[in-house]
Regions:
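Short, polar loop motifs at secondary-structure junctions
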Residues: 8-13, 132-140, 198-204, 262-267
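Catalytic core of nucleotide-activated saccharide and alditol-phosphate transferases
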Residues: 88-188
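N-terminal pre-catalytic "stem/leader" segment of glycosyltransferase-like enzymes
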Residues: 1-104, 110, 266, 311, ...
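A conserved nucleotide-sugar
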Residues: 184-203
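Short, well-ordered beta-strand core segments
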Residues: 76, 99, 130-131, 234, ...
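Catalytic binding pocket for nucleotide-activated donors in carbohydrate/polymer assembly enzymes
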Residues: 19, 206-216, 221-320
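Active-site regions of enzymes building and remodeling cell-envelope glycoconjugates
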Residues: 21-31, 40-48, 128-130, 141-153, ...
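Structural alpha-helical scaffold elements that stabilize or flank donor/cofactor-binding regions
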Residues: 69-70, 123-124, 226-227
């Protein structure tokens, strides 16, 4: 297995914890961002300086020692870290050049300028790392290496409990509130039990509605897992430019749940079934109640192996040197 430097997010931690102890020992969690004007200025100088900035310690000393301990020819996966300054500094503290970066966001996300994001990708590729994406459109447009989206097997967390909600959603706004409210109001009027929970955009106010629960802050991932177990079906609404498989889709597959989605690309998945996926604006809306009650077809043995983190990460063992 390659060494891994991973972002400090709770979902990432959930994936990493699926690794056996001997493999988990090869994982470094990247430090959270340190706030402060002085530190930010010195960090920027260190990032763009061709050598290490004398007298400046960009990350905690134990972390820097662990970076230096990675062997010169060892394969290394940088998982979900895209900050250019951090990556430029990391490169100066790593002896290996067999490095891959997996981007866990679409190239053009909902809040960034197209040209700015394109510049970011050019800088990312200019570091000399091999850049991987789960999104086929991004791979084609920007010359990135395509790989699978990733999740993990969840047997220790999956519970067979009576469903409390027919449809469950959790996510940030990302310009999806209006659609969530419309769908929620339609489904509630049809007698369906919904729980659509949304983290608001900072500074934005929202009209009152019983269809969408506006959260004061994000919830921890174990609480999300508990809600998934208590739902019959999950809802995903993808970003406008996204074509790749989402984590929400994999949550549904691994937790044995149905999925309602606005992504027609799910029809191309090897495990697509009309009894497993309901595509908004393509499948008849009147069919939704029957879809929710139809038994979920079983998946073939091993069908999800390519998306399971412990299997997925093995592809990076064979990284060529930059």
């Amino acid at each position: 297995m390659p060494h891994i430097i991973a972002n400090p997010f709770t979902l990432t931690e959930f994936l990493l914890d699926s690794l056996p102890p001997d493999q988990r020992a090869k994982v470094l969690v990247h430090p959270k961002r340190i706030k402060g004007v002085g530190y930010s200025v010195l960090k920027a100088l260190d990032a763009w300086c061709p050598f290490r900035l004398p007298g400046f310690q960009p990350f905690p000393e134990p972390y820097l020692r662990e970076l230096a301990a990675i062997e010169p020819h060892a394969p290394l996966l940088i998982f979900g870290i895209e900050n250019i300054k951090d990556l430029r500094i990391l490169r100066k503290h790593l002896r290996t050049r067999r490095i891959a970066v997996f981007t866990w966001n679409p190239v053009i996300d909902y809040q960034q300028n197209h040209k700015v994001r394109q510049l970011h990708i050019r800088q990312l590729k200019g570091l000399g790392f091999q850049v991987f994406t789960f999104d086929p459109g991004d791979a084609q447009r920007y010359g990135l290496t395509l790989t699978q989206q990733v999740y993990r097997y969840v047997e220790p967390f999956r519970q067979e409990v009576p469903p409390e909600w027919d449809i469950y959603f959790l996510g940030q706004d990302k310009h999806r509130f209006d659609m969530l409210r419309m769908l929620g109001e339609q489904w509630q009027a049809a007698g369906l039990r919904t729980r659509l929970r949304m983290v608001p955009e900072p500074g934005r106010t929202y009209p009152a509605t019983t269809a969408v629960e506006i959260l004061p802050q994000g919830i921890d991932y174990p609480s999300n897992i508990d809600a998934i177990n208590r739902a019959r079906c999950l809802l995903e609404i993808t970003q406008a430019n996204q074509t790749g498989l989402t984590v929400r889709c994999l949550e549904a597959l691994f937790f044995h749940k149905k999925l309602i989605t606005n992504n027609p690309g799910v029809r191309q998945l090897p495990f697509y079934s009309a009894d497993r996926f309901f595509v908004l604006d393509e499948d008849e809306a009147s069919r939704l109640p029957a879809f929710l009650q139809t038994p979920l077809p079983p998946l073939p043995t091993g069908a999800l192996d390519p998306y399971d983190f412990a299997h997925w990460v093995q592809q990076f063992d064979w990284l060529p040197p930059a």
